[in-house]
């Protein structure tokens, strides 16, 4: 059997660079080598594309604070076929070459999950796993996600947009959350308890983007759904719940550094009707934003039992603690099957 040539892109320029590397490391451990021939390019923080040996990626730790970007050969991209070679990625000395049939961009955050890399791949004519340029861009911007969902009568967490130079106002009272609109992994997010903390939280969020959201702190439960669509089956998984143990919210450190800071409850304890409502909402959001392949949809369940959209991730994490592959396994799609189905659907 001829194997499908799949190029994995990871790293990137965002604050989630290390998370992307860890996600890709674990994807490569799980993927079926008999069906797929793999290539690996790491995008470093200087935007260089590096051809990296898989063993070097596998050697990185799972704690992002201890991750160093692997070194490799710098690659160039040729978007057209010539007499000498086809469209693909090549080292400067042409000793390394890879002409992918499918690209799997395991990239999170700005520059990787916001339509940027998707636009590059689409312009190059390379099929890629995950959201389109439009869907990735919408899903990355929390304010735009919510604006579109409001038009579709989908309940969302209320929000107020503030930019540098605007009058800094909190219309919701305290506690509230201040966060960048276009960042993931809780980077730049602060839980604010008083007026005296608001300005510093705003300045922290500005380190990660120009558009800042202020949102009320929802009293209730944080619940997530994995959505999968390969054109043959459209799945909304059982629910998972995040319960913070040591922190006020699910921060970057709680997600990736301190394994005891939060408890992941899989499956979440919900009534049958509650789960059906949540799954229906997740599928609606996936369709409204025109997502493709995969997404994780994050909700709050407030004290009245109402579900509110928090955000959607169009390229969810695949780290050892990531909710998406765990929920898909609970839905009956194991890690290797999940990857294979996404790639085959993209190729076809």
Residue positions per predicted region:
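Active-site nucleotide/adenylate-binding loops and adjacent lid/helix of ATP-dependent enzymes
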Residues: 2-10, 14-15, 21-22, 93-97, ...
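Short hydrophobic/aromatic-enriched beta-strand-loop microsegments
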Residues: 127-131, 156, 235-236
